[in-house]
Amino acid sequence: MGKECRDIVELKEKLGIYVDDKLLLQAVTHTSYAHEQKDVVDHNERLEFLGDAVLELAISETLYKKYPELPEGELTKLRAELVCELSLVKIAEKLDLGKYLRLGKGEDSTGGRDRRSTLADTVEALIGAVYLQTNYDQTKQLILDLFKDQLSHIDNQRIGDYKTMIQELVQDRYGDPPKYQIVKESGPDHDKSFVAEVQINNEVVGRGSGKSKKEAEQNAAHFAFQKLSK
């Protein structure tokens, strides 16, 4: 088995989804490689164009459903953070994508395998190839798997922001800051759970649980914010 065939098999295993060999090979083919060949070779720019659109739709839909309380402007910011070049490069590095690229000699000799723009474009081309081979739902699932760490990071950021967000909301409406209280503590010392309540003018507006007091308060703030911003 030649190197290209081995590379394609490896990449398929990493993606965990069937893609036609020819289509997958096209997805990792840079324009510089195609231009150096005597025979006509398809490069990945059209697949990148398609993958970019599918990626944006999948992330937009995910954020829309995940954060029903956020306005359009905030959703746009989160999407931009997720589909930026840095985010795509992290995914490329996780797949060791540079190893599989088909590059022209000049591009290869000048560091093309590590070039951020090339890696990011190739991730989008792979998404385009998967979409053509399968369907939107399967491609979306692959995207969610690939972006799992980035989505989790945003989740953690959002939870951390809710205490600040509800503080601003409550002080603007009521003048006084919200108050937090731990109302339940259970479990052994090495595995405790906590329940917190957030109160506004002595009225409980949110309750949340967590493995630490801070997490419980953050989750209570999240619940309260969703309730008050309806």
From Swiss-Prot:
Any matching Pfam family? Ribonucleas_3_3
EC number of the protein = 3.1.26.3
Positions of the RNase III domain: 8-135
Q: Which GO terms describe its biological process?
A: mRNA processing; regulation of gene expression; rRNA processing; tRNA processing
**Cell compartments where the protein resides:** Cytoplasm
Keywords annotated in UniProt: Cytoplasm, Endonuclease, Hydrolase, Magnesium, Metal-binding, mRNA processing, Nuclease, RNA-binding, rRNA processing, rRNA-binding, tRNA processing
Q: Name one GO molecular function term.
A: metal ion binding
Q: Which SUPFAM superfamilies match?
A: dsRNA-binding domain-like, RNase III domain-like
Q: Which residues are responsible for catalysis?
A: 52, 124
Q: Which family does it belong to?
A: Belongs to the ribonuclease III family.
What is the name of the protein in this document? Answer: Ribonuclease 3
Q: Lineage of the native species?
A: Bacteria, Bacillati, Bacillota, Clostridia, Natranaerobiales
The primary gene name is rnc
